[in-house]
C-alpha cells in the first residue's frame, strides 16, 4: 500500500510539472512568457513573444526557371495582428539582372513559406508565391505592396504583390532608384461568417412558452371560444326554416288532388 501510494504521488507530481511547463506556440517560434528576442538571419527567432518571422524570397531570371534568393523578412505580430518588413538592398549585379529581365518582359516572383518561423524543407509545408512583370516593378522604382493571407490556424494561405503605379511604359529609371524596396505590407486574417443567434432564439422561444402558460385561453379553438354565440344562431336558423318547409309540402298535396 505504501509503495502504491508513493507511485501515485510521483505520477501526480509529474503531471503537475508537465502542466506547468512553458508551452511553445506551434509554428510561431515564440514561447509563452518568453522575453523579447532578436530576429535571426534564418527567420527562426522573432523580435518578441507573439511575433513570428517569414522568410521573404524573390526570383528574377532570364530563363523560365526560378532561383529564389533572400529578399528580407516579414515580421508578423500575432498579438496585435500587425505585419512589418525588413529588406536588404539590391546589389549592382541584381539591379542589372532585373533590368535585363524587364527588357524581355520577364517575371519578378516572390514567395514565403506556408508555416511561419520555418525554413525550407518539410517543416515549411511548401510555399505560396505571386508575381508581377519585372518591367512594372522597375518603373515603379521598387514600390510594391505585399498582402499576406492567413487562416485561423496561423498558416499562410496566400500572397499577393501589387506594384505602383503599375504598367510598363518604357520610362527611364535611374540606377539609384533600384537600390531599396519601398514596400507596404498588410495582413488579411480569415473572415468569419456570422453565426446563428441561438441564444436569442432560445430566449424568444422560452418567452413565448411562458406567455402561453400564463394565458391558456389563447390555446382554445375558435368554436371553443365562441360556442355560446354560434349555437343560438344555429338554433334560430333551424327553427325559422321549419314552417316554410311545412307550407310548401301542403301546397303540393292540394294541387295533386285536383
Swiss-Prot record:
Q: Which UniProt keywords apply?
A: Angiogenesis, Endoplasmic reticulum, Membrane, Secreted, Signal, Transmembrane, Transmembrane helix
**What happens when the protein's gene is inactivated?**
Knockout mice show no cardiovascular phenotype at baseline. After myocardial infarction however, capillarization of the infarct border zone is impaired and the animals develop larger infarct scars and more pronounced left ventricular remodeling and systolic dysfunction compared with wild-type mice.
**Under what name is this protein listed?**
ER membrane protein complex subunit 10
Per the record, the similarity remark reads:
Belongs to the EMC10 family.
What is the documented function of this protein? Answer: Part of the endoplasmic reticulum membrane protein complex (EMC) that enables the energy-independent insertion into endoplasmic reticulum membranes of newly synthesized membrane proteins. Preferentially accommodates proteins with transmembrane domains that are weakly hydrophobic or contain destabilizing features such as charged and aromatic residues. Involved in the cotranslational insertion of multi-pass membrane proteins in which stop-transfer membrane-anchor sequences become ER membrane spanning helices.
Q: In which tissues is it expressed?
A: Up-regulated in the left ventricle 3 days after myocardial infarction (MI). Expressed predominantly by monocytes and macrophages from bone marrow, spleen, and peripheral blood 3 days after MI (protein level).
Its organism's taxonomic lineage begins at: Eukaryota, Metazoa, Chordata, Craniata, Vertebrata
Which parts of the chain span the membrane according to its record? 222-242
Q: Does the keyword Electron transport apply?
A: no
Give ranges for the Cytoplasmic compartment: 243-258
UniProt GO BP? angiogenesis; positive regulation of angiogenesis; positive regulation of endothelial cell migration; positive regulation of endothelial cell proliferation; protein insertion into ER membrane by stop-transfer membrane-anchor sequence; tail-anchored membrane protein insertion into ER membrane
Which residues, if any, are the signal sequence? 1-25
User: CDD domains annotated for this entry?
Assistant: EMC10 (cd22209)
Q: Does the keyword section mention Signal?
A: yes
Under the heading Pfam families, the entry gives:
ECM10
> What are the GO cellular component annotations?
EMC complex; endoplasmic reticulum membrane; extracellular region; membrane
Superkingdom of the source species: Eukaryota
Assembly and oligomerization:
Component of the ER membrane protein complex (EMC).
Q: Which residues are on the Lumenal side of the membrane?
A: 26-221
Amino acid at each position: 500500500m505504501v509503495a502504491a501510494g508513493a507511485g501515485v504521488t510521483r505520477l501526480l507530481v509529474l503531471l503537475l510539472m508537465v502542466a506547468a511547463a512553458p508551452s511553445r506556440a506551434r509554428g510561431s517560434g515564440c514561447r509563452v512568457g518568453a522575453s523579447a528576442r532578436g530576429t535571426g538571419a534564418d527567420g527562426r527567432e522573432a523580435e518578441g513573444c507573439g511575433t513570428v518571422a517569414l522568410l521573404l524570397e524573390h526570383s528574377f531570371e532570364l530563363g523560365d526557371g526560378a532561383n529564389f534568393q533572400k529578399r528580407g523578412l516579414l515580421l508578423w505580430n500575432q498579438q496585435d495582428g500587425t505585419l512589418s518588413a525588413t529588406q536588404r538592398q539590391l546589389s549592382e549585379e541584381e539591379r542589372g539582372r532585373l533590368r535585363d529581365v524587364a527588357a524581355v518582359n520577364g517575371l519578378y516572383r516572390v514567395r514565403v513559406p506556408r508555416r511561419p518561423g520555418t525554413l525550407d524543407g518539410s517543416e515549411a509545408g511548401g510555399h505560396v508565391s505571386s508575381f508581377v512583370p519585372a518591367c512594372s516593378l522597375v518603373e515603379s522604382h521598387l514600390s510594391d505592396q505585399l498582402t499576406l493571407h492567413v487562416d485561423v490556424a496561423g498558416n499562410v494561405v496566400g500572397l499577393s504583390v501589387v506594384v505602383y503605379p503599375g504598367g510598363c511604359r518604357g520610362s527611364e529609371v535611374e540606377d539609384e532608384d533600384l537600390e531599396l524596396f519601398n514596400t507596404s505590407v498588410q495582413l488579411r486574417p480569415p473572415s468569419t461568417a456570422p453565426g446563428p443567434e441561438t441564444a436569442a432564439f432560445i430566449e424568444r422561444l422560452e418567452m413565448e412558452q411562458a406567455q402561453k402558460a400564463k394565458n391558456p385561453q389563447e390555446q382554445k379553438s375558435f368554436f371553443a371560444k365562441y360556442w355560446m354565440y354560434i349555437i343560438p344562431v344555429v338554433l334560430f336558423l333551424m327553427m325559422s326554416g321549419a314552417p316554410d318547409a311545412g307550407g310548401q309540402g301542403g301546397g303540393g298535396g292540394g294541387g295533386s288532388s285536383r
